[in-house]
Design a protein with these regions (language model features):
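Short amphipathic alpha-helix used as the core "switch/output" element in two-component signaling
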Residues: 44-45, 67-79, 97
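Acidic catalytic/metal-coordinating carboxylates
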Residues: 38-41, 65-71, 90
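… and, occasionally, acidic/histidine-rich disordered N-termini of signaling adaptors
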Residues: 135-320, 371-387
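Two-component/phosphorelay signaling modules centered on CheY-like receiver
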Residues: 12-34
Length: 387
């Protein structure tokens, strides 16, 4: 693409001089010259054709001088537009003033065309650099916009409302969850859904990695898990089938840890399977805390055709569960110390409120602990109370 140069000078001979000297570059399409005879005419041309690259302007002109034109050009706020000022030899005051106003360079009359050519080439290098930076900034802005859209889409995937149950069992539980991605989008997710008239299914999961790849794998995993879970009565069999599907077309180093529980709201009977996930905290009605016993299984998508185990426990009214991802326990403070499971269980033991109160207590303590340390992993919590 031709370098577009606007020459602004009230001397008519300069137009002939420039077109003659640069005729080869003009013929090759490297340079494209336009001419104005004063600042007013030049400014009008700039406003009508804002794609000029270089302004070659005399300082002393009628109607609008070069310094005034330079000030008006600065108002256009185009960092890719470079101004080369032309002044009489020895007119250092005007040259200094032009440079202070942001001129790229200057040359003196009589014009040394060889020197002017080198100055134009230097300006062209700067223009190419600025335009490349502008393009990269535009691409970054586009990517950020797409990530914002992806974030909104991911947020719509996560459930917002509790599943509907008859009044006879609806009052037996409360549940709250939250997810805070380390980047625009994350690989953690949670889910909860009605299986039948008395059973509630709930899931927390953590995909390996972060960012867009993890978010895509998260959406796939969540869809497969939920689809199978709604028609499969067994936690273990649900994870086995999901693992089989994820392993068929697995991407290298992509897997997902999952805790899946099914709670009978009428009896408090809890069945669960754990595919390599952090064991949830069980908070008994009297404040005692313990970690649910792991089932010893590995993450989904890592190894095909393996069985998964299922364990059971019973909740009584007043008992609560806190499910979490390792972004909680592995969060670090400014000294490099991990938040850890012990701090988490201590918070659970001291918080006696609703699931939302429990989540608030954990996130508040986490924020106080990490301080100014940037979040390095997705943080997800799901709290459930049985009443």
């Amino acid at each position: 693409m031709a370098l577009k140069i606007l020459s602004v000078d009230d001397e008519a001979d300069l137009e002939i001089l420039l077109t003659q000297y640069f005729r080869r570059k003009i013929k090759k399409g490297e340079y494209e010259f336009s001419f104005a005879h004063n600042g007013v005419e030049a400014l009008k041309m700039l406003l009508e054709h804002p794609d000029f690259d270089i302004i070659l302007s005399d300082i002393n002109m009628p109607e609008m001088d070069g310094l005034t034109l330079l000030s008006r050009i600065n108002e256009l706020r185009n960092p890719a537009l470079k101004c080369i000022m032309v002044s009489a030899y020895g007119d250092m005051d005007n040259i200094r003033s032009a440079m202070n106003k942001g001129a790229f360079d200057f040359t003196t009359k009589p014009i040394d065309l060889g020197d002017l050519e080198r100055t134009i080439e230097k300006a062209a290098e700067q223009i190419a650099f600025v335009k490349k930076a502008q393009d990269e900034h535009s691409q970054l802005a586009s990517i950020q916009n797409e990530l914002h859209v992806a974030q909104e889409i991911q947020e719509t995937i996560l459930p917002k409302e509790l599943p509907c149950f008859d009044e006879s069992v609806r009052g037996h539980f409360d549940l709250k969850a939250c997810m805070k991605a380390a980047k625009y989008v994350g690989g953690d997710f949670y889910d909860f859904f009605r299986i039948d008239s008395t059973r509630l299914g709930f899931i927390i999961a953590d995909v390996s990695g972060k960012g867009v790849p993890a978010a895509i794998f998260m959406a796939i995993s969540r869809t497969i898990l939920r689809t199978i879970a709604l028609s499969c009565p067994s936690c273990a069999d649900c994870l086995r089938q999901t693992n089989g599907m994820l392993s068929q077309d697995s991407v290298e180093d992509m897997f997902v840890t999952v805790f899946y529980g099914i709670l009978d709201l009428g009896t408090g009977h809890l069945k669960y399977s754990n595919a390599g996930h952090n064991p949830p905290v069980l908070i008994r009605h009297d404040g005692r805390t313990s970690l649910l016993e792991p089932t010893g299984d590995i993450a989904l998508g890592a190894v095909p055709d393996i069985p998964y185990c299922e364990k059971e426990t019973v909740l009584v009214p007043g008992d609560r569960l806190l499910l979490y991802t390792d972004g909680v326990t592995e969060a670090m403070n400014t000294s490099g110390e991990l938040f850890g499971v012990r701090r988490l269980t201590d918070i659970c033991a001291s918080s006696s409120g609703s699931p939302q109160d429990l989540i608030n207590a954990v996130t508040s303590s986490l924020s106080d602990f990490t301080g100014t340390t940037p979040q390095s992993d997705d943080i997800t919590l799901l709290a459930l109370s049985y009443r």
